[in-house]
């Protein structure tokens, strides 16, 4: 990373202030070229910026000089706190582009440099990406916990414990080499396992499993997925509109009005939801397009965190958490359900307040607690592999095979925080960031 990058890291102009970040070995020279001198490190300094090509006055503003490695990226950095007009920012960016060795940053490149220089690890970078995309308070607090290293600190402790277990085992193996214990002597080799070896492995695996048993990050990021299902004209779309507080779905007395999935994200009391309205389920009378919609409705139900079933009692999709809903409490002629969780009317509002409260409480119980770190799919997979390796090591009688399982465990922990990884995976992650971050 020998080149120097720059980008607007604040919001798009016009704005009160526009902040341009510069990072790389040429950051100091770039700042000097525009400001005429290099200010004192880490002190906000008022400076007049001029275009190095012709001396044109660009702006009078605050600048910061941040020499590395104790910076966000681990490199020399500079910040220009400009007046946030489009023309001002465009002129300063053009001046920076004219300097040799400087180029515009790609999405996420500042954070990628921070990762490459050891300022953050992969788990913290993933938390930062989630923090930037957070839209609800619950998402923000969970992402912040990850970005501030909640998982990374645990991984460091687990790795230290695992290294201690491994060191005791390796010492026993070294001792066996000196005493020339035969490879085929199973009893003697089993006796080489350190005292409490299996118990130590299981204890560490249990610590990992407490994290594996936590609610996952995906439902929080994507929204707790609630699918409304039932036959045509059961009141699904009316209830859907009431939940999202928007006339998102067309409602009519004609059966089959909804023919495809209609998805809408909404936050209820700070809890993220994804509500899905579906085509009415029926076996007869549906045209070709409606049949496609019905197939999609059944597929959506299989992916739901919760199904709101508005059809005949007991006939809802099996295999997922399901609430029986009688959605026409305002209609005296509508049938009631004996085991119904809720009788309500989205038209009159009857029962809706209690229903919303129950829905929010149910989602909260399935999502990470406020401020609690949560594993994503990648992290969960690696941590599961580590726990399995520890359990295999505990069950192993051959110390050589036990040592190999411990090595696999260490490798999994390293992958968890990005000490090992592939460029493709890193490209995907940092591509989620905006330019200037």
Swiss-Prot record:
Keywords: Cytoplasm, GTP-binding, Hydrolase, Magnesium, Metal-binding, Nucleotide-binding, Potassium, tRNA processing. GO terms for biological process: tRNA methylation; tRNA wobble uridine modification. One of its GO terms (molecular function) is GTPase activity. InterPro entries: G_TrmE (IPR031168), GTP-bd (IPR006073), GTP-bd_TrmE_N (IPR018948), GTPase_MnmE (IPR004520), MnmE_dom2 (IPR027368), MnmE_helical (IPR025867), P-loop_NTPase (IPR027417), Small_GTP-bd (IPR005225). NCBIfam families: PRK05291.1-3 (NF003661), small_GTP (TIGR00231). Belongs to the TRAFAC class TrmE-Era-EngA-EngB-Septin-like GTPase superfamily. TrmE GTPase family. This is tRNA modification GTPase MnmE. It comes from Novosphingobium aromaticivorans (strain ATCC 700278 / DSM 12444 / CCUG 56034 / CIP 105152 / NBRC 16084 / F199). The lineage of its organism: Bacteria, Pseudomonadati, Pseudomonadota, Alphaproteobacteria, Sphingomonadales.
């Amino acid at each position: 990373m020998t080149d120097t990058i720059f980008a607007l890291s604040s919001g798009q102009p016009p704005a009160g202030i526009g902040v341009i970040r510069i990072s790389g070995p040429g950051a100091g020279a770039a700042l000097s070229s525009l400001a005429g001198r290099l200010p004192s490190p880490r002190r906000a300094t008022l400076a007049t910026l001029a275009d190095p090509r012709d001396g044109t006055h660009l702006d009078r503003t605050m600048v910061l000089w941040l020499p590395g490695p104790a910076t966000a990226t681990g490199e020399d950095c500079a910040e220009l706190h400009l007046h946030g007009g489009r023309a001002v920012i465009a002129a300063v960016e053009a001046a920076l582009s004219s300097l040799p060795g400087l180029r515009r940053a790609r999405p996420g490149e500042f954070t990628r440099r921070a990762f490459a220089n050891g300022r953050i690890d992969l788990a913290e970078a993933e938390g930062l990406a989630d923090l930037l995309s957070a839209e609800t308070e619950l998402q923000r607090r969970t992402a912040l916990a990850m970005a501030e290293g909640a998982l990374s600190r645990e991984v460091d402790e687990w790795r230290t414990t695992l290294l201690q277990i491994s060191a005791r085992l390796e010492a026993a193996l070294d001792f066996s080499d000196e005493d020339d214990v035969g490879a085929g002597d199973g009893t003697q080799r089993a006796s080489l396992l350190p005292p409490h070896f299996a118990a130590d492995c299981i204890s560490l695996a249990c610590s990992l499993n407490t994290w594996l048993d936590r609610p996952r990050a995906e439902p929080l990021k994507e929204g707790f997925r609630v699918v409304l299902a039932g036959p045509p004209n059961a009141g699904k779309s009316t209830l859907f509109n009431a939940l999202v507080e928007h006339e998102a779905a067309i409602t009519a007395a004609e059966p089959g009005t909804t023919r495809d999935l209609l998805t809408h994200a909404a936050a209820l009391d700070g809890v993220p939801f994804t509500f899905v309205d579906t085509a009415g389920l029926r076996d007869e009378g549906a045209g070709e397009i409606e049949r496609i919609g019905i197939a999609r409705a059944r597929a959506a139900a299989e992916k739901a965190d919760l199904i709101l079933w508005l059809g005949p009692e007991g006939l809802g999709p099996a295999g997922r958490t399901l609430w029986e809903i009688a959605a026409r409490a305002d209609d005296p002629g509508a049938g009631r359900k004996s085991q119904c969780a809720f009788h309500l009317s989205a038209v009159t509002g009857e029962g809706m307040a209690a229903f919303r409260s129950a829905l929010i409480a149910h989602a909260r119980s399935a999502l990470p607690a406020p401020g609690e770190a949560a594993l994503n799919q990648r992290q969960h997979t690696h941590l599961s592999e580590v726990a399995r390796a520890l359990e295999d090591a505990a069950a192993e009688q051959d110390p050589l095979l036990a040592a190999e399982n411990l090595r696999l465990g260490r490798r999994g922990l390293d992958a968890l925080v990005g000490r090992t990884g592939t460029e493709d995976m890193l490209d995907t992650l940092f591509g989620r960031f905006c330019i200037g971050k």
